[in-house]
Amino acid sequence: MSLVVPDNFQHILRLLNTNVDGKVKVMFAMTQIKGVGRRYANIVCKKADIDMSKRAGELTTEELERIVTIIQNPSQFKIPSWFLNRQKDINDGKSFQLLANNVDSKLREDLERLKKIQTHRGLRHALDLRVRGQHTKTTGRRGKTVGVSKKK
């Protein structure tokens, strides 16, 4: 960032219903959007032909629109399906990129489905226990029973 701030510099921009810091470089600014990581932000910048050394506040409205269309429609811009965060969806079998509030809602739907069909993972989630095979004999004892009190 140069010492003199240009006139059209935006300190906070609105991208996909998220406030993004304009002082950060473009790639890292996009990671503030839920569902967009550094790798996905990198490939979006390359597909949109945007200089990586630019700050997010220096982007023109046309460049911002390009970024938004690429993020929302990755398959049209030849981003491979293995790069997306939702592959082979259980309902329609398609792959797509979940963004912002959709990430939370899809996760909640998945957990509800697991609980409904009573899989092992779903039951562990329902009982608030560890799901991924961790040992639970000594750790994770929050809030269950109180320890033994010593006599005086």
Swiss-Prot record:
Record keyword Ribonucleoprotein present: yes
SUPFAM superfamilies linked: S13-like H2TH domain
UniProt keyword list: Cytoplasm, Nucleus, Ribonucleoprotein, Ribosomal protein, RNA-binding, rRNA-binding
Top-rank lineage group of the source organism: Eukaryota
GO cellular component term, pick one: nucleus
GO terms for MF: rRNA binding; structural constituent of ribosome
Alphabetical GO biological process terms: cytoplasmic translation; ribosome biogenesis
InterPro entries: Rbsml_uS13_C, Ribosomal_uS13, Ribosomal_uS13-like_H2TH, Ribosomal_uS13_CS
Chief location of this protein within or outside the cell: cytoplasm
Protein location: Cytoplasm; Nucleus
Free-text function comment from the UniProt entry: Component of the ribosome, a large ribonucleoprotein complex responsible for the synthesis of proteins in the cell. The small ribosomal subunit (SSU) binds messenger RNAs (mRNAs) and translates the encoded message by selecting cognate aminoacyl-transfer RNA (tRNA) molecules. The large subunit (LSU) contains the ribosomal catalytic site termed the peptidyl transferase center (PTC), which catalyzes the formation of peptide bonds, thereby polymerizing the amino acids delivered by tRNAs into a polypeptide chain.
The protein's assembly and partners: Component of the small ribosomal subunit (SSU). Mature yeast ribosomes consist of a small (40S) and a large (60S) subunit. The 40S small subunit contains 1 molecule of ribosomal RNA (18S rRNA) and at least 33 different proteins. The large 60S subunit contains 3 rRNA molecules (25S, 5.8S and 5S rRNA) and at least 46 different proteins.
Protein family: Belongs to the universal ribosomal protein uS13 family.
Further remarks about this protein from its record: There are 2 genes for uS13 in S.pombe.
Protein name from the UniProt record: Small ribosomal subunit protein uS13B
Organism field: Schizosaccharomyces pombe (strain 972 / ATCC 24843) (Fission yeast)
Name of the gene this protein is made from: rps1802
